Amino acid sequence: MVIMKKMKDSVLFLVVGLFSLSVLVSQSIAGRVKAPLLQSNTGGLVFSKSFNSIYDTSMYGRLQLNNGLARTPQMGWNSWNFFACNINETVIKETADALVSSGLADLGYIHVNIDDCWSNLLRDSEGQLVPHPETFPSGIKLLADYVHSKGLKLGIYSDAGVFTCEVHPGSLFHEVDDADIFASWGVDYLKYDNCFNLGIKPIERYPPMRDALNATGRSIFYSLCEWGVDDPALWAKEVGNSWRTTDDINDTWASMTTIADLNNKWAAYAGPGGWNDPDMLEIGNGGMTYEEYRGHFSIWALMKAPLLIGCDVRNMTAETLEILSNKEIIAVNQDPLGVQGRKIQANGENDCQQVWSGPLSGDRMVVALWNRCSEPATITASWDMIGLESTISVSVRDLWQHKDVTENTSGSFEAQVDAHDCHMYVLTPQTVSHSDV
């Protein structure tokens, strides 16, 4: 959370091709294997010998959640970035309605997540969490029923501390009771924050809620919000479906770019079942330009970050809806191969001319040319840089223009990119037969 931060106590030799995703994911979730997510049988026709080191996934570990969730990054909406504590059941219902009427729900934005301030300031006489009687008078169960009736899922918020960041009751030492009541209400998602944690290490505080959620018998997405304090990518793959790798995002260019760089560090650790989380989307909140928001959405999608809308979807501009509803970029984020793309090269003053890329199913690549400079720049992605064999020919599709740029390009690809803008492409090999997973 932003407002109460001062109250913390302590704060892939050759690969891709046809990928046996479902087998590996199911085994990983059962905790039976620890192996790279990318498997080789392309025979070296597409990818260079350096591909394995560029897109390393060997650090991805075993999952212990047993909830079968997060095979692709979660998509939905969260109340905090726009509403903060100014939430109530009407806002949540209207947001669910807007996700459906705008078409966003059909694109995958299915989680409607309530953040802090939903509960009363005190537990009841039996020690149970209670919805605030003025803002959620109908209770969470009826609200969940309404959200479910729209084909969506309801998320809720708590904290791995004695209080939430806004000083509502936390779930530390109440994990079993709170998990049980969340399940009884029909909750589908839990964001679990890190305030008022009594100085207890996150690696000790977060597993009890995992175990309590598992014990309910209900599949509840478990989102760890530890702010990256103790490098959760190193251990949270055994605990949650996603883990925050950074402090809170703000609706500024500086905050968004900094967080993208911090999250990039942990690319090798993410994959189906558990994802690095660089925090929610700020698109539509007004602090950045249209071009900057395009970059925000492009890089979050390429990084396989959760796509959680943070604006008021009831009152979106056409530009905001255009960005959030880009089906081709959403498809990159939700690609079944599930490998986080990463920053491959940075040139220019302050490394502002950047190439980000990653593998997709069907021997394809996604490439983002991101100009973080203050002037237009020509940015080049070479095959050697992104791990393609130098002789391979590809077709190039522009995901923002929704058109094929070229059908036969080899060696490299470049584009003129405006200041603070981002171009995003899918490269498909033309000389190899392949099938999408």
UniProtKB/Swiss-Prot annotation:
Q: What induces it?
A: May be processed or degraded in a VPEgamma-dependent manner in vacuoles.
The record's Gene Ontology cellular component field reads:
apoplast; plant-type vacuole; secretory vesicle; vacuole
Which chemical reaction does it catalyze? Hydrolysis of terminal, non-reducing alpha-D-galactose residues in alpha-D-galactosides, including galactose oligosaccharides, galactomannans and galactolipids
Which cellular compartments is it found in? Secreted, Cell wall; Secreted, Extracellular space, Apoplast; Vacuole
**UniProt signal peptide:** 1-30
Question: Which residues carry a glycan?
Answer: N88, N214, N250, N315, N408
Q: What class of enzyme is it?
A: hydrolase
What protein name does the entry list?
Answer: Alpha-galactosidase 3
**What are the TM regions of this chain, as residue ranges?**
none
What EC numbers are recorded for this enzyme?
3.2.1.22
Gene Ontology molecular function, alphabetical: alpha-galactosidase activity
Q: Which family does it belong to?
A: Belongs to the glycosyl hydrolase 27 family.
What do we know about how this protein assembles, alone or with others? Homodimer.
Give the annotated active site.
D193 (nucleophile), D248 (proton donor)
Pfam families hit by this protein: Melibiase_2, Melibiase_C
Residues noted as binding substrate in the record, renumbered to the chain: D115, D116, K191, E226, W227, G228, V229, D230, R244, D248
| Cysteine-cysteine disulfides | C85-C117, C165-C195
